[in-house]
Each structure stands twice: as structure tokens, then as C-alpha cells.
Design a protein with these regions (language model features):
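Binding-site signature for planar aromatic cofactors or substrates
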Residues: 1-274
């Protein structure tokens, strides 16, 4: 069953997105056609047909959105309700009403070290209704994913560092999956049940969201963002088949240095002359 989408944001969703204590995920397209997922807690509704988010660090997504303006998004509230949708980037600004509103938020108002220095504006394409996370099913799915991981475990390339494997294996860490459907739209799903299966794979059961996961074609380019309550995060990208992601790239999405850690973008040569 495909999710139902709407062309405007209802009042309940606007109120939820206006809250600062939420998790926001933005999906842009990278240079290889993979979804690139970023933690964007500042995303909120400007009105019924537009969204905004603020920038306070120079991550890759803010550059990618200029080349590929069509994006996906998912927002998860503190009371475990979520929505998702798609939008198109239109412009950005470093002055104006929204700029002042963002920087007057309690977290940033008296913060002289870090503030929003650019606001991004997006036109809404579609948005889902607010839905509760099925916590009971997630617990069952997490157990089944860990059993599955025992049978598909692979650690030949050493793609995902040990700290990333530990982050994925935490039962309370959040995970979000994204792929592009047949029409080229980014589809985001919460996949809290996912876990690491060695350093080279991520395993997830079909509970919950089994029908939605079955819509992902074998061999599709898929990305999964994992983060915990300490805001530690890692992004993996790879090819998906039957509930297993074969990791091709690993991106450190935490400041201060956000970069690919597998394969490494730079080589370190040993010092031989003293």
C-alpha cells in the first residue's frame, strides 16, 4: 500500500514542525545518484505550501541542493509521530524575517559562537499525514534484524568503523532510510530496526513497514542515516537487496569535519625522513 500524500500542510503538522525538540532529515542527491541524508532539526513549515530550514554548519547537503533542488524530508516529533514528503528548493537568504526568527530561537538567541547564517526556502510538492511510530513492532523488528545479521554478516572491506557499527547496533538509536522511486522522488522511512551486520552490511527485517520496504527494487541505491540522542551520527550508502544494504560509502556527518571516511578521500603517507 502506497502512502497517501497531500499538497498542503495541515495545522497539526505545522504545529509539530514548529517545535524545536524534533528530528528532521533532509534527502538531497549526491554526485553518484545516491540519496544524501542530513540531520536538519531546524526544518519547519513557513506556511501551508512552503518549508524553511536554517544553516549553521557547512555540510555537503547545502551544496548538493543547489545542483539538485528536488529533495525529500522526514520529521519525527518527541512524542514519536512522524511525517514525510518532498519539496523543491527555491532560494536562500541571510537577512529578513525568517532569518531573525531562527536566530531568536531560545537555543541560539544568546549563543554568540554559533547561529544560523543562511535560511533555505522550499516549495512543498507533497506531504504525508502525521503517523505514530509503531513502537511494539519496532522492538520485534529490532530483534529479528539482529538474528538476520548473524546470517548475513560480512567484514571484508572494513567499510564501517567500529564506532559506526556500535552506533547502528544501539537499540535506542534512530535510523532513516531513503531511496528514489520509479518517478525519481526521494522516499524516506524510519527503520529503527536496522542494525550493523559486520563492517560491510546493514541488515533490517520487514517489521515494521514491510510493504514499504518491498517497494525498494533489488540493486537500488539506498542510504541510511543513523543517529543517537547524543547527536552522534553516521551515514552509509550502498546497494540494497532483500533487506540487506551492501555498504559502498560511509560519510561522517558530525561536525567539525564532515567527510567520507570510506573510501577515504585522502591518503595519509607515513613519515619516513626525520
Amino acid at each position: 500500500m502506497k502512502p497517501s500524500y497531500f499538497s498542503t500542510i495541515d495545522s497539526a503538522s505545522i504545529k509539530m514542525m514548529d517545535c524545536d525538540s524534533k528530528v528532521g532529515v533532509l534527502a538531497t542527491e549526491d554526485e553518484r545518484g545516491y540519496p544524501h541524508l542530513s540531520f536538519i532539526s531546524s526544518i519547519q513549515a513557513l506556511n501551508e505550501q512552503a518549508l524553511t530550514f536554517g544553516q549553521f554548519s557547512a555540510g555537503l547537503s547545502k551544496r548538493l541542493i543547489l545542483d539538485h533542488p528536488r529533495v525529500g524530508f522526514l520529521v519525527l516529533s518527541a512524542d514519536k509521530r512522524y511525517l514525510s514528503g518532498n519539496a523543491t528548493y527555491t532560494h536562500s537568504a541571510n537577512t529578513g524575517k525568517e532569518f531573525d526568527l531562527y536566530n531568536n530561537k531560545p537555543l541560539f538567541r544568546y549563543n554568540s559562537y554559533m547561529g544560523f547564517y543562511r535560511i533555505f526556502y522550499l516549495n512543498l510538492e507533497r506531504i504525508s499525514a502525521l503517523k505514530p511510530l509503531p513502537m511494539g513492532a519496532i522492538i520485534v523488528g529490532a530483534i529479528l534484524s539482529r538474528v538476520k545479521a548473524l546470517f548475513v554478516k560480512k567484514s571484508e572491506k572494513g567499510a564501517l568503523p567500529f564506532v559506526g557499527q556500535s552506533l547502528f547496533s544501539q537499540l535506542d538509536s534512530l535510523k532513516f532510510l531513503c531511496y528514489y522511486d520509479a518517478s525519481g522522488e526521494a522516499v524516506l522511512l524510519p527503520v529503527v530496526q536496522a542494525t550493523s551486520a559486520g563492517s560491510d552490511r546493514i541488515a533490517l527485517s520487514g517489521i515494521p513497514f514491510g510493504r514499504a520496504l518491498k517497494q525498494i527494487p533489488d540493486g537500488a541505491k539506498v542510504s541510511i542515516l543513523c543517529l543517537n540522542l547524543k547527536m552522534e551520527s553516521v551515514l552509509v550508502k550502498g546497494l540494497y537487496s532483500d533487506g540487506v544494504l551492501e555498504i559502498e560509502r560511509v560519510y561522517n556527518s558530525m561536525p567539525p569535519k564532515m567527510e567520507y571516511v570510506y573510501p577515504r578521500s585522502e591518503t595519509i603517507s607515513p613519515v619516513r625522513d626525520f
